[in-house]
Amino acid sequence: VCLLSRTDQPALFCGDTLFNAGAGNCHNGGHPNELYETFAGQLAKLPDETMIYPGHDYIANNLQFTLDREPDNEKAKALLGSAEKQDPDAALVTTIGLEKEVNTFFRLHSPTVICRLQEAFSDVGDNPDPKTVFVKLRELRNSW
């Protein structure tokens, strides 16, 4: 369940659906295909300035996963440095625009992400569709 506030500064209270630099898991219900549809059909279409307020703060660990999948993501490297130094009482707040740059689950067309998936899964073809990339990333993240 997510709540979108459409004020001067749009904000998304996204519970366990979207995390800073990550995506929710489907262990307690839901399906990765449905989560993909939420990301592609709803979250990615929000204005870039939309502030993100997830239910939990896993940003450092999620950025480490991003860099495992996309080691050349300079924006994620810089944000990880900031996240590791953050005051726990003043957590970083990201935006949809920043998430599109650092969140692997929004970076489904990245050549590096796709190449690394092909190394991990023999059944990922040369031009996987975004849903396949998302579902395979979610599978990797489940055991990462």
Language-model features: where?
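His/Asp/Glu-rich metal-coordinating catalytic cores
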Residues: 1-36, 72-73
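Short, conserved beta-strand edge motifs with alternating hydrophobic and charged residues
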Residues: 14-15, 52-55
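Accessory terminal helices/loops
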Residues: 37-51, 58-144
